[in-house]
Amino acid sequence: MATTAGAKKGLWSTIRRIAASDRISGLIMLGFALTGLVLANLPATAHAFETVAETHLFIPYTNLDLPIGHWAQDGLLTIFFLTVGLELKQELTTGSLANPKAAAVPMLCAVGGMIAPPILFLAVTALFSQIGPGEPGTLILTTTGSSIPFSEMSHGWAVPTATDIAFSLAVLALFAKALPGSIRAFLMTLATVDDLLAIILIAVFFSSINAWYWFIGIAVCAAIWAYLVRLKKVPWIAVGIVGILAWIMMFEAGVHPTLAGVLVGLLTPSREMHGELSPRAERYANKLQPFSALLALPIFALFATGVHFESMSPLLLASPLVIALIVALVVGKPLGIITTAWLSTHVGGLKMAKGLRVRDMIPAAVACGIGFTVSFLIASLAYKNAELSAEARFGVLVASLIAAAISGVLLSRQSKRFEKTAAAAAADEEDDESIDGDGIGQPSHTTEPTTPTEHPGTLADGTASVEIDFRH
């Protein structure tokens, strides 16, 4: 019995270590994303995959009757957003966002990184609508050849705004082992604010309010959650029921239900209480991390990229929508971040972290062009047209892979430079210690330094005096 318990504990520890590794969890999610794309387009598996994705599951006495693919997006992804909410609360209280002055540059860079991509996206799609093969003001979908008005295509402006922190950190972990921790801290702060802004975007632009009275229920659930998670002994069954009710009411209200996770996460205490050694928000986020990284995100990625294309060919890369997303994420994201960093430090008078220059952030800024999770979600919310949504998600996947590849090369080179600099500094330090230890450079004999000699004397009034002889 003890052996079984020990084995289970060991297995759970291994799972938590895998989930905590940005590199491994990022590669797992990428693997599921590519698997979804392959399964949806291989003749042998396409029908079975579509059947599973479109199988409906419903909850009695509610309007919840969704296909499995949507349950992955609206249900499972709530675990990820709950983890984000808990981490945000901790960062706002005791983490990188607790001191706005210290975090000012990455916070502003997050804003800049969300402004530039939509501008480039709209510029590229507008250009294609004028010079493309279709009628002026329209764009041609590569997959079906159908004509789409620019006004409809422009609904996807928010798709390239988000950064996938898990993938960005995975790229850093893979290619940037010798980089200073300040670069990772900068990226973490930027991505945290990016997540917050993406949540606001979804709430404001991609929610359709159905009935105001649901918000009363949401507020009641929020208040009960805030009370229950502050009790000395948390009643987890009651907390779970309240969380599920908040999710259902969000759905009924027309707000994207994953935001229920963010709401309750932000209401969780982030300081030590009842004599506990660590904040509850931090502990709960750590416990949820395996479910988020190894369950919710991979399954979501599987169905999000599992879109069927009638003609799966390299011509998809020539799609105006795909090109616009590649330009927006691969060029727009780093351009917005670096431009904002330069303006903040050279014009605004703000300072980067000690030892960091604006140009040091270029490789990490390119990594911020990895969209994935939230970009997939926004693509499915922004486009009601199934073909547009499919091409948008494909564009996000391609753009993210390109951004990951470019940032990987840049980070690897940057890491080698930092490694050489650190090695040279260490060698210089060893040489200095060797010189000091061996006495190299010291004179072969020493002469006693000339010092003044004191001759005490007495003044006429009897006061003691000192006569200093410099001739000695």
Curated annotation (Swiss-Prot):
Q: Name one GO cellular component term.
A: plasma membrane
Q: Where are the residues of the annotated region Disordered? A: 422-472
Q: What is its main location?
A: membrane
Question: Which keywords annotate this record?
Answer: Antiport, Cell membrane, Ion transport, Membrane, Sodium, Sodium transport, Transmembrane, Transmembrane helix, Transport
Where does this one sit in the cell? Answer: Cell membrane
Q: In which residue ranges is the amino acid composition biased (Low complexity)?
A: 445-456
**GO function terms (MF aspect):** sodium:proton antiporter activity
InterPro entries given in the database record: Na/H_antiporter_dom_sf (IPR023171), NhaA (IPR004670)
Ranges that cross the membrane: 24-44, 66-86, 108-128, 156-176, 196-216, 234-254, 290-310, 312-332, 361-381, 392-412
Q: Per the UniProt entry, what are the Gene Ontology biological process annotations, in alphabetical order?
A: regulation of pH
**Per its UniProt entry, which superkingdom is the organism in?**
Bacteria
Kindly name one Pfam family recorded for this protein: Na_H_antiport_1
Q: Which reaction does it catalyse?
A: Na(+)(in) + 2 H(+)(out) = Na(+)(out) + 2 H(+)(in)
* Ranges annotated as biased composition (Acidic residues): 427-436
Membrane association type: Multi-pass membrane protein
Q: Which family does it belong to?
A: Belongs to the NhaA Na(+)/H(+) (TC 2.A.33) antiporter family.
Question: What does this gene product do?
Answer: Na(+)/H(+) antiporter that extrudes sodium in exchange for external protons.
- HAMAP family in UniProt: NhaA
Q: What is this protein called?
A: Na(+)/H(+) antiporter NhaA
Species source reads Bifidobacterium longum (strain NCC 2705)
Gene label:
nhaA
